[in-house]
Amino acid sequence: MLQDMDAAEIDYVVVQSQYRRTHEACVEHNNQLLTLVRRWPQRVIGFAVLQPMVGAQALDELRRCLDNGIRGVGELNPYAQGFAINHPDFLRLVETCIAYDVPLSLHVSEEVGRYYLGKSTTPLRHYYWLACRYPELKLILAHWGGGLFFYELMPGVRKALRNVWYDTAASPLLYPTGEIFEVALRCVDHHKLLFGSDYPLILFPRRQMEPDLHSFREQVKQLPLPAEIRAAVLGGNAAHLLKLDVVSESTMPAPGESNARAEQPAVQPTTVEAPVHGFMAVAMVAEHWPQTRAVFERYGIPWRDSPVPFWEPIVQAAAARGYGPTEQRRLLDELNAAIT
C-alpha cells in the first residue's frame, strides 16, 4: 500500500474496514489497524469499525480506539451489519461520535441500477433522516452518497445536509469520471467532496490486473477543474475534516478523559405531544405510541419505515388509500383514543 501511495503521490491514507458483523471481529480488525497507525503515523489514519448492536461494548471499543490514535468511525453498513439507522444503540454511537468530534462514515448504495456484491438496500431517506436528526454529526456518505447529493439542489435539503460529505470510493465502477464530477459540482459545494478509492478494489477491471491508487487519481487530476477545486477534492477537504491542517492532538481526548465520559449518552427523543393531528408523520406516531399501530393496520396504512417514508403525514397516507375527510376524522379519533 505504501508503494502505491508513493506512486500516486499520496501523503496520507484513511484506512477503513470491511463491515464486521461481530464485536470480536471488529476488535480484531481495530487491533490490526492500530498496529498500522503506530508504525506509520505520518502516512496512515485509521477509522474504527464497530458493531453498534452490542451497545455499551461498542462505545467502550470506540473510546479505546480514540485514546490510541484512531481518528473516526467507519465504514459502517446498516444493511450488512444488521442495524437500523434509527435504532437506539446506533444513535448512542452517533452521539458518542459527536461528543468526541470525530466523523462517521457510512456505506451507501444507489437505489437503482444493476445488482452487485456489496449493494445495500438501506433507503436514502434513512441517511437523510440521520442528518436531519443530528445536524452536528460529521457524516461521510460513501460512494457519492448513493446519489443523495443530487437533492441538494433543493434549498431545504442543502441546509439539512450542510454537515454531510460525499466520498468517491469505487466511482469508476459505477460512473464515468468526468460526468459524475460535472454533475456533483453543479449540485454541491466542492468542499463536500472527498477523494476515496475503495483500495484494494480493482477499479478498472478491463485493463487492470492489480489494484493501485494512481489510475483513478490521475483521472481526477486530468479533469478540467480549477486548481484549487482539484486540490481540495484530492486531499484538502479531507485534511480539513480530519483537522490535519491544525493541531492534530486537539481532536483527541486527553489521557483519562474517556473514563470521565464513560457513561452512555442518552438518546434524545423527539418531542411529540398528544393529541394526534392530521399532519403528524405516520411513522413518528407509531413509534411514540405503539398502541396506535393496530389502528393504522385496521385502516391499511403501513407504519413501518420500510414501506413508508418517515415524513409521510397521516392525512396523505389516508387519502392515498381512499379515505375522505369523514374517515380521516374517524381515524384521528381512534388514534387519540388509543393513546389515552
Locate predicted features:
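Active-site gating/metal-coordination segments in enzymes
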Residues: D11-Y12, R20-G118, A170
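Mid-to-C-terminal alpha-helical segments outside catalytic/metal-binding sites
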Residues: M1-Y12, V188-L194, L203-V267
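Conserved, mostly hydrophobic/aromatic
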Residues: M5, L33, C65, V73, ...
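Domain-level signature for proteins that mediate thiol-based redox and metal-cofactor handling
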Residues: E263-T340
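Conserved residues at the C-terminal ends of beta-strands
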Residues: Q16, L76, G196
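Catalytic pocket-lining loop regions of alpha/beta-barrel enzymes
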Residues: I70-G72, G82-F195, P255
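A general structural detector for well-ordered alpha-helical segments in enzyme core domains, enriched
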Residues: M1-D4, H29-L36, E61-C65, D89-L93, ...
